[in-house]
Amino acid sequence: MLNLETLKNELNPQQYKAVTTTEGAILIIAGAGSGKTRVITFRIAHMLDKGIPQSQILALTFTNKAAKEMADRIKSLTQKKLQNLTVSTFHAFGVKVLRADIDKLGYRDNFSIYDETDRVSLIKECGRELKFSPEAMDIYMIGNLISNIKTGRKNWDTSNDMYRPLYESYQEGLKLFNAVDFDDLIVLPIKLFKEHPEVLAKYRERYKYIMVDEFQDTSHQQYEFMHLLADKNVAVVGDDDQSIYSWRGADYQNIINFEHDFDVTEIRLEQNYRSTGTILEAANGVISHNTNRKDKKLWSGNGAGKPIEIFMPEDETDEADFIAESILGIACEEKRKYDEFGVLMRSNSQGRFIEEAFLQNNIPYTMSGGTSFFERKEIKDVISYLRVIANHDDEINLIRIINCPRRGIGRASIQLLNDEANLQGCSMWNAMISLVQRQESPASETVKEDFSEFMKIIEEHRQKLLTGRGLSQKIRQLIEDINYKDYLLTEYSKNEKAVRFKMKNIESLLNSIEVWENDPDNDNPNIFNYLNRITLMSRDNEDENDKGKVNLMTIHASKGLEFPVVFIAGAEEGLIPHARSVEENNGDVEEERRLFYVAITRARDKLLISSCRKRRHMQMVSEVEPSRFLDEIPANLVEYHEPKTVTIEETGKMFGDFLQQLKSQM
């Protein structure tokens, strides 16, 4: 039970105010390391202890990892089952809304959610049908344009109007395939709420208390979504100084919009529990140069700590060697484990030299942004089968699996299917039925048999997978029935090691499904909910295999993390701030400064920054200037160093000493 006395003992005065102010519109400005998650979870636990029903509370955040952590902490605090409490990402909640009422927009409730691979496939298909030239098919640019038009971030004009037919074809394709993309998971619920007020009224009646985490990262559409849902009891938690995602639609001006649209009580959390005083003074010094911000000053009770060290290596090779050697030295001298180090970069391209130095020095590391488990071919194949079983009209995934494993349905047969679908104005699945059943069919008897075999497999397993429990066992049977292992052996020329690796991945998938369906909090473990889950699953899940390794990542990827020792690599003009932000001069430099601020505030005990004198770009070596942000750190907090050249013998001795220390700890 979280009585008020307990809360006073557990929280500082501002946190206590944020937790116990449960009525009205609340803006909680939570600086880096100020105990934001603690405040959110204590606040919800306090509301439950006050007798507010779980079913009336909606907490929205941005990643599945954050949502799970939040729910786990609330459960631990309250010792209650949370079956009726909604803690969700924006997109997952959008799916929930659409599954219940998307029929009002002309879709069926078994719609597919297209991931980036599916989306790219559809864009390419639309481009081919409209006979766009290869030069005009810049998939990255077109994908961004479609997203920006759909979400209202951009309008049609003379510079992009040539792509209007492709956009319309893409939208028609989604509707035809009974599919939605990620943008639709916010855009369509807004459309639903506006066009069908009775649907909105249902959710406003249920959710009397709404909380939004990482509010500075909300887009215009997410703000509108929240604004439509919220009545009067809404609390948002964020920090305008950590708004670093404008390139994907985030708008920290939503904080100002919130103050305009609601009668707001503002509470500021400025006590930092993570970093030393020196690190916070440096962060405050840098961010104070931004003009469009809420004035705040982080402070710490952790003591001043060590000065910030800035190194000026000759080039990126020297920089990488300096980082590797420093990690070896600090790990040895301060008895630190490798996973206590974070190496942060503005761009992934900086990582190549650092990775080489780590390999040469036998430093284990993990780099964020590798291939997602769910993007591996064998996993994608299995999931595509499940998508088609759940939604026959999902043509992107149907085309992927119709000849996987190979069953004689080649390009000519697929083209025949496509032509028939266009002629009949129906889905490819219905075209397949028509071709098989018609007497006067352009399909040969062999092609008909191939189509029939495929449809039989899908229909048989549809009957099994859509009824009852035991999802993992039914999927295992599907994999056996299509002889997927034999297919892999053929595809990989009987390379049994590669096949074992891929089958092991499939086994991991099946095990994860089994764990998910047996979770006591999972009251409806059906195929639709599973497909929702994996499509929305963030790539932010921590891999257990990454324990004991140095963390190498972009600054963007480091948001929300902390490390005892942090290196910021490449603090140079052109990298941070990025050259593009300086050239465009449209406020982007302020976002770059916020990015540097985020990097600084990841550090707990020790911060080291490197700024090269020269850097390679486009096969040319150029002199570079230190980042302007270095000059914004108060001079009394900084020690400048020339990189020390460490001999091979010294490195070997440090490594040997480190191994001895590890042995003594075992």
Residue ranges and their predicted role:
Residues M1-L4, E639-M666:
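Acidic, low-complexity intrinsically disordered tails
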Residues L2, L7-K8, H46, H220-E316:
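Conserved RecA-like helicase ATPase core segment
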Residues L2-T6, E23-I26, G31-S34, A45-Y207, ...:
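A basic/glycine-biased coupling hinge at the interface between accessory DNA-binding modules
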Residues L7-E23, Q221:
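N-terminal pre-P-loop "Q-motif" helix
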Residues G24, I52-Q56, K81-N84, D231-N233, ...:
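Short glycine-/polar-rich loops that comprise or flank the Walker A/P-loop
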Residues I28, A32-I40, Q54, I102, ...:
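Helicase P-loop NTPase motor core
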Residues M211-F215, V237-G238, I568:
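Hydrophobic residues in beta-strands of the RecA-like P-loop NTPase core, especially within AAA+ ATPase
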Residues G351-I363, R376, I383-N636:
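Conserved helicase C-terminal RecA-like lobe
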